[in-house]
Design a protein with these regions (language model features):
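Acidic, Ala/Val/Gly-enriched low-complexity intrinsically disordered segments
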Residues: 5-7
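Macrodomain-like recognition of ADP-ribose-binding/processing modules
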Residues: 9-148
Length: 148
C-alpha cells in the first residue's frame, strides 16, 4: 500500500537536501577567492603541484611545493594520488575535522581525485558524507548528485 505520508517524506527529504546544499555548490571555475574562502584541491603526497587544480592552487592560492597535505595560504591539499579510495579517506576525514574547527572559513571543495588521479565522483563523493550538513563546506555538483 502506498501512503501519502510516504510521498510527503520523500518530498521533505528532497526539500531538506535542497535547503542543505543551497549556496553550497562549488563553482566549476574558480579564479578568485573571498578573504575567508579556501580552495580545496587534490594533491600528491610529495606536494608536486604541477597540474590540474593543484597547479591552480600553487599559482593563485598559496599552495606550497613540497607540501602535499593541509592548509597552505588560501588552499587546502587532500592527497589523492597514493592508491585507492581507502587511502584517501583519512585525509578527507582530517579535512572535515579541520573545517569543523574553523567555522570562520568557507571551504570550496573541487572534484578532488576526479581529474589526473582518475577516480569518478561516485568513488570520492561518499567520503564527504559528513560534510553534507556543514555550512562552511561547498561541494561540487557532481558530489552532491551522489550523496543526496
Amino acid at each position: 500500500l502506498f501512503r501519502s505520508d510516504n510521498v510527503n517524506n520523500i518530498f521533505n527529504n528532497k526539500k531538506n537536501m535542497e535547503d542543505m546544499k543551497k549556496g553550497r555548490i562549488t563553482p566549476s571555475w574558480i579564479d578568485s577567492l573571498k578573504e575567508n574562502e579556501i580552495f580545496v584541491f587534490g594533491s600528491n603526497l610529495a606536494g608536486m603541484h604541477g597540474g590540474g587544480a593543484a597547479r591552480i592552487a600553487r599559482l593563485h592560492f598559496g599552495a606550497v611545493m613540497g607540501k602535499g597535505v593541509g592548509l597552505q595560504g588560501q588552499s587546502y591539499a587532500i592527497p589523492t594520488m597514493q592508491g585507492g579510495v581507502e587511502t584517501i579517506r583519512p585525509y578527507v576525514e582530517e579535512f572535515i575535522i579541520f573545517a569543523h574547527q574553523h567555522p570562520e572559513l568557507h571551504f570550496l571543495v573541487t572534484p578532488i581525485g576526479c581529474g589526473i588521479a582518475g577516480f569518478e565522483a561516485e568513488d570520492i563523493a561518499p567520503l564527504f558524507e559528513k560534510a553534507k550538513e556543514m555550512k562552511n563546506i561547498s561541494l561540487p555538483e557532481s558530489f552532491w548528485e551522489v550523496i543526496e
